[in-house]
A protein has these predicted regions:
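Glycine-enriched alpha-helix->loop->beta-strand junction motifs that scaffold or abut catalytic
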Residues: 23-27, 50-54, 75-80, 100-105, ...
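Glycine-rich phosphate-binding active-site loops on the catalytic face of alpha/beta enzymes
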Residues: 78-90, 131-141, 179-203
Length: 210
């Protein structure tokens, strides 16, 4: 089980400083969609150069032109790139094909997919690397989370690894760990903490205990 730190509301220098605080406790750094919008793929390049030992995920949320966008993110140094589960199979296939060429990984984000079980089955057959249940900011504000959806994909997905994102904090992490996802994605649960390093360290300890 790995920890991914999601960075959304920072610029590149702030991102570098933040990762420095927690780098020994995390496995993947996510360059979130807002950062990509504000800074471009340069953010991926600079974080990968600053922390070559960490995997970098580019949260592009690809909906079309899968092959091309995977190629551009790969050139910037991304190790993992996101595609939306709500897109069509042709886009996912194009993304998977290009990712294999570039020796990169695809994470499919199931945000706003209505029938998680049936869509996860379809996507799992397309050769993606991760399938991720995700409660976005707007639904988190309504008190929702993806813990039940994680159970669904754990029971459904046979080939891809599983991931969960959205609203995970130190006090809710044990519930997530019980489901044994392969990747736990934490944003504000670390970035909003008074002591980011201590929080990330405790999360790593909890995960190690399983």
């Amino acid at each position: 089980m790995e920890i991914q730190l999601a960075l959304d509301l920072v610029n590149i220098p702030e991102a570098i400083e933040l990762v420095k605080e927690v780098e020994q406790y995390i496995d993947v750094v996510e360059i979130g969609t807002p950062v990509v919008i504000n800074e471009g793929l340069r953010a991926v390049k600079e974080i990968k150069e600053a922390f070559p030992q960490l995997k970098v995920l580019a949260d592009l949320k690809i909906m079309d032109a899968g092959g091309y966008e995977i190629m551009k993110a790969s050139e910037a140094g991304a190790d993992i790139i996101t595609v939306l589960g709500a897109t069509d199979d042709a886009t996912i296939k194009g993304a998977v094909e290009e990712a294999k060429k570039q020796k990169k990984k695809i994470l499919v984000d199931m945000i706003n997919v209505k029938d998680i079980e049936s869509r996860a089955k379809e996507i799992d057959a397309l050769g993606v690397d991760y399938i991720c249940v995700h409660t976005g900011y707007d639904l988190q504000a309504e008190g929702k989370n993806s813990f039940e959806e994680l159970t669904t994909i754990k029971n459904t997905v046979k080939n891809a690894k599983t991931a969960i994102a959205g609203g995970i904090k130190l006090d809710t992490l044990p519930e997530v760990i019980q489901q044994k996802p392969d990747l736990v994605i934490v944003g504000g649960g670390i970035t909003s903490a008074a002591d980011k390093a201590e929080t990330a360290s405790k999360m790593k300890q909890l995960i190690a205990q399983g």
